[in-house]
From Swiss-Prot:
GO terms for cellular component: cytoplasm. It catalyses: L-glutamate 5-semialdehyde + phosphate + NADP(+) = L-glutamyl 5-phosphate + NADPH + H(+). It is found in: Cytoplasm. It comes from Desulfotalea psychrophila (strain LSv54 / DSM 12343). Keywords: Amino-acid biosynthesis, Cytoplasm, NADP, Oxidoreductase, Proline biosynthesis. Catalyzes the NADPH-dependent reduction of L-glutamate 5-phosphate into L-glutamate 5-semialdehyde and phosphate. The product spontaneously undergoes cyclization to form 1-pyrroline-5-carboxylate. Its EC number is 1.2.1.41. One of its GO terms (molecular function) is glutamate-5-semialdehyde dehydrogenase activity. It is an enzyme of class 1 (oxidoreductase). This is Gamma-glutamyl phosphate reductase. GO terms for biological process: L-proline biosynthetic process. PROSITE patterns: PROA. Belongs to the gamma-glutamyl phosphate reductase family.
């Protein structure tokens, strides 16, 4: 078979599997996910052996530490995947849930019901744990999934997919509910993006180049997990005791992820009280800081920022520092350089906090807490398939609810339209 014929066949099989999944009971879906968790533990050595092939190739290619961190299937990452599966199992199944019902004057009862989207294509880079997280959510929501990971994680993704398919087979569920595109060339993605008769939604998750490529070339609706250029605005009415813990956690806990902090905005009225000590603490933790001209006199650890630095998703221990004159300046800066992912404010002023929540456009706005909380697990959604920075049809972490759509259910008793 040619490359195109192979990928078209994957789409056809996925569509057939999606039809099978529509009639699957919640207990059957949960049984599959439970078995996946058991197999992840039982086959940990195999998974890490395959993952090491990817890590070795990555080191040889000179991948950054942040990229290698995302790629690694450590014991803790595998434990986290198992935990995520248990959380998804515990979540209520949205499929079949009726959302309200009204009685029309003609006697018709009209309601809406949650139903699966159908077939979802997931295109992602580096992080092999996405394979499990995405498949778990799609299966629980009754969707078939086609996975196309990055070439840097090919061995890891194929190993994880084999676990998923084995669990499906053991539960006597169509194994084509989960399929992986093993071809690593970009032509495979281009072909897949043209399968509008088989695929209902495409979710790209990775670097800016991948997102733009998918958006430009897809004939299928795209739900974008765009870059995370996240900021924290330190307001003039901030509680100074909260500033350092929030900023340090948001930047350093895991700098290579999309909800890590990439910039801080400090009101000029408190910059002298905040920045010298904060910059010293960040520098001691290995954080590189690039700041505006107003910030430079307050710390020797800050170097002058270039225009390219503003709005950059560093994904490493690097942070932009900007001094602003007002709330309006902070809001304008975020509008220009933010990516509509996560924006935080540190303030004790209720009015300012309320304005920030209402006026700043992001999938999550955070008051007096770390940007790292914009995460499906932290927000009670269980594992997430990504964080959407587009507003249709989901905005923010995409859990089970966001992987369904709604259809009208009309109950009558012989009514005809006049």
């Amino acid at each position: 078979m040619t490359l195109e014929e192979t990928i078209v066949e994957v789409g056809v099989r996925a569509k057939a599997a999606a039809a099978d999944l529509m009639s699957l009971a919640t207990r059957q879906k949960d049984a599959v996910l439970s078995q996946v968790g058991e197999l992840l533990v039982a086959e940990k050595a195999f998974l890490q052996e395959e993952n090491e092939k990817d890590l070795a190739a990555g080191r040889e290619k000179g991948l950054s530490d942040a990229m290698l961190d995302r790629l690694a299937l450590t014991d803790s990452v595998i434990e986290s995947m198992v935990k995520g599966l248990k959380e998804v199992i515990a979540l209520p199944d949205p499929v079949g849930r009726t959302l309200g019902s009204v009685k029309r004057p003609n006697g018709l009862s009209v309601g809406r019901m949650c139903v699966p989207l159908g077939v979802i294509a997931m295109i992602y880079e580096s992080r092999p744990n996405v394979t499990i997280d995405a498949a778990a959510l799609c299966l629980k929501a009754g969707n078939a999934i086609i996975l196309r990971g990055g070439s840097e994680a090919i061995h890891s993704n194929l190993a994880l997919a084999s676990i998923l398919r084995r669990a499906l087979e053991e539960a006597e569920v169509n194994p084509d509910s989960v399929q992986v595109i093993p071809m690593i060339d970009r032509e495979a993605i281009t072909i897949m993006l043209g399968l509008e008769d088989s695929i209902d939604l495409v979710i790209p998750r990775g670097g800016e180049g991948l997102i733009r490529f998918v958006s430009k070339n897809s004939s299928i609706p795209v739900l974008k997990h765009y870059k995370g250029v996240c900021h924290a605005y330190i307001d003039k009415d901030a509680d100074l005791a909260k500033v350092a813990p929030i900023v340090i956690n948001a930047k350093t806990q895991r700098p290579g992820v999309c909800n890590a902090l990439e910039g801080i905005l400090i009101h000029e009225d408190i910059v002298a009280d905040v920045l010298p000590g904060l910059a010293t603490e960040l520098a001691e933790l290995g954080v590189e800081m690039r700041g505006c001209s107003q910030s430079l006199p307050f710390s020797e650890h800050i170097v002058a920022a270039s225009e390219e630095d503003w709005g950059t998703e560093f994904l490493r221990l690097c942070l932009c520092v900007k001094v602003v004159r007002s709330f309006e300046d902070a809001k304008s800066y975020i509008r220009k350089y933010g990516s509509q992912h996560t924006e935080a404010i540190i303030t004790e002023n209720y009015t300012t906090a309320h304005r920030f929540v209402a006026e700043v456009d992001a999938s999550a706005v955070v008051v007096n807490a770390s940007t790292r909380f914009n995460d499906g697990g932290e927000l009670g959604l269980g594992a997430e398939i990504g964080i959407s920075t587009t507003k249709l049809h989901a905005y923010g972490p995409m859990g089970l609810e966001e992987l369904t759509t709604k259809k009208f259910v009309i109950l009558g008793d012989g009514q005809i339209r006049s």
